[in-house]
Design a protein with these regions (language model features):
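Active-site beta-strand->loop->alpha-helix modules in alpha/beta enzyme cores, enriched
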Residues: 1-145, 183-184, 198-205, 212-219, ...
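Conserved beta-strand scaffold positions in the cores of enzyme catalytic domains, especially
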Residues: 73-75, 149-151, 167
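Residues at the C-termini of beta-strands that transition into short coil/loop
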Residues: 77-79, 153-155, 171
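Short, flexible loop segments at boundaries between secondary-structure elements
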Residues: 136-164
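A conserved mid-domain beta-alpha-beta active-site/ligand-binding segment of alpha/beta enzyme cores
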Residues: 158-216
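C-terminal accessory region of SF2 helicases/translocases
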Residues: 234-236
């Protein structure tokens, strides 16, 4: 759900706005829980629920901006994540079952997954392991013969040029469109919970990475573009 990546002040802001619209025991409790929380405390279940809902709303905002209908957006809520702490539970059969279910329902021709193994608190790695385990279980299904899996990099490191198997050129307008979509994830900008060693904003890192990839292709004698998104194919 991404709930632990939402800062307390962001959750408090939402709870106070909701409470000001009409008294609610739930939001009153959330405001109290956040106010009484110490640096050694974990979030209460109500606070975690609010933070997870905030992340969902931000994602829906971004996908709407990109023109994706709400009924085509699915949230997995993998159980391994829901500990309320940075340390997660081990990946379990229930996580794989959820991943299997969404793939079997949609029967996708392409799957795009974050290959950010440099993610400071490892969530992307675990999600990727869940996908790989699911692919291993489903690979003999007839519909999987037409499915390709592409891995991209996010806010951290880009693929090396010799690893890239698909590069998608981007115009200046597309770069700006991607930036605006990232901005919908309001709680993940302006000093986030898990920044890593790079202090640049996530959207700045993403743009710099895309522009640098385009420059590398230009130096190889290929066409010049504003930016390029790079992918590596995962064979299963």
């Amino acid at each position: 759900s991404g709930n632990i990546a939402v800062a307390d002040h962001e959750a408090l802001k939402v709870a106070e706005v909701a409470q000001s619209m009409g008294e609610s025991n739930m939001f009153k409790q959330i405001i109290q829980d956040i106010g009484q929380k110490t640096t050694e405390d974990y979030d209460s279940s109500l606070v975690r629920k609010l933070k997870g809902t905030i992340r969902r709303a931000e994602s829906i905002g971004a996908t709407r901006y990109m023109g994706i209908p709400d009924d085509q957006v699915h949230f997995l809520d993998l159980p391994f994540y829901e500990t309320g702490t940075i340390k997660k539970n081990p990946l379990g059969p229930e996580d794989i079952a959820i991943m299997n279910q969404i793939i079997e329902t949609i029967k996708p021709h392409q799957i795009y997954a974050a290959g950010d193994l440099a993610d400071p608190h490892g969530t992307h790695r675990v999600c990727l392991e869940a996908l790989f385990a699911s692919l291993e279980e489903l690979k003999k299904k007839p519909f999987m013969k037409a499915c390709w899996v592409w891995l991209y990099r996010g806010a951290w490191h880009e693929w090396d040029i010799h690893e890239i198997e698909m590069a998608v050129p981007m115009s200046p307008e597309q770069v700006l469109r991607k930036r605006k979509a990232i901005f919908y994830h309001q709680t993940q900008k302006d000093g986030v919970m898990f920044q890593g060693e790079d202090l640049r904003e996530f959207w700045v890192r993403a743009e710099d990475r895309n522009k640098d990839t385009a420059l590398k292709y230009q130096k190889l004698g290929l066409a010049s573009y504003a930016a390029m998104e790079a992918f590596v194919k995962y064979d299963f």
